[in-house]
Structures are given as C-alpha cells and as structure tokens.
C-alpha cells in the first residue's frame, strides 16, 4: 500500500506529549521516523505505567507506546561529539528534523536550524516546545 509520506525520513529528538504525538502521526502516514533517545532513555518510558494493578500489563507504558508507535529508536549521547555527528549525518539524508529542545540546547548540540541547513539546505527543521519560542515563558521546556 502506498502511503502519503513514503520515502520521507524524519529525525526526531523529543519527549513528553506534543512533539512525539506529531511524529507518530507522520509515522502513521508512512514516514520513516527515527527517534533519538539519550542513553538513559526517554523519561516518558516510565511515566504511564500502572505498577499497582495486578495484571501482566502493569509494566506496559500506554502513553509512551501510543506516542511512539511506528518509530525506530536510536540511542545517541548528544553530550559527546560523536553523538552530534551521528544526528547530523542522519539529518543530511532526512527531509524533516523535529525536536522540542530550546534553541539554546539546539545550539549547544549543533542541531540548530543554521547548522543543519548548512548540512542539508532542503531540510525542514521543526521545533515544537510547550511554551513557544517567544514571550515570557519561552525559556520553559
């Protein structure tokens, strides 16, 4: 079956709700989405578990699985130069890079729009943060 986003590669660095949900929709539409996670894993992996219920599902994290359905996961340590190089290499081949990192963090890891556009001028660089990029709460993640 042909999907609308076949042949689209998305590199995603994010956690919590909005941005992972957007990535899941892109995967639903046929994009190949590679989720980059830190060595400690996405903090959402353990947020939705219900360990107090007596069920085989008590270790199943529904929210994480819903928000990350259809994605591949790759562990990358962005605090190391090799980690940044891996993500930049992936972005050189991707059509979309999406993240919910504040601009300062994007710059720290050399994943800001200017740096990635120099590597891939046709890349769509999408930032989705909880409080936007301007205004009094823009500094909040």
What are the functions of these language-model segments?
Residues 1-141:
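N-terminal helix-loop segment corresponding to the beta1-alpha1 unit
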